[in-house]
Regions:
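Mixed-charge, Lys/Arg-rich low-complexity intrinsically disordered regions
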Residues: 1-16
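Short beta-strand-centered aromatic/proline hotspots
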Residues: 22-31
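SH3/SH3-like beta-barrel fold
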Residues: 36-42
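Intrinsically disordered, low-complexity, charged/polar segments
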Residues: 1-2, 43-68
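Acidic surface patches and DE-rich sequence motifs
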Residues: 18, 30, 40
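Short acidic/polar mixed-charge low-complexity motifs
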Residues: 20-23, 44-46
Length: 68
């Protein structure tokens, strides 16, 4: 089991993996500890999401994959 990710530390450009297997790039972080705004880079369950921007719930973030 992975350690929880502290999303307050994540800035724009950081790539993270989500619970559903998708990968997103953070666009902005309101620093509320609950939400991130991110762009989908991959989405195995719904390829139509790739390129779209959505709010991501903190509990859906499972791993930091890289970034600035």
């Amino acid at each position: 089991m992975n350690e929880p990710v502290n999303i307050r530390l994540l800035g724009p450009g950081t790539r993270v993996a989500l619970l559903d297997g998708a990968t997103v790039e953070i666009v902005s972080n309101p620093l509320d500890g609950v939400w991130l705004f991110a762009r989908y880079l991959t989405s195995p369950d719904d390829p139509a999401r790739v390129g779209s921007e959505e709010m991501i719930f903190a509990q859906d973030v499972v791993e930091i994959q890289g970034g600035p």
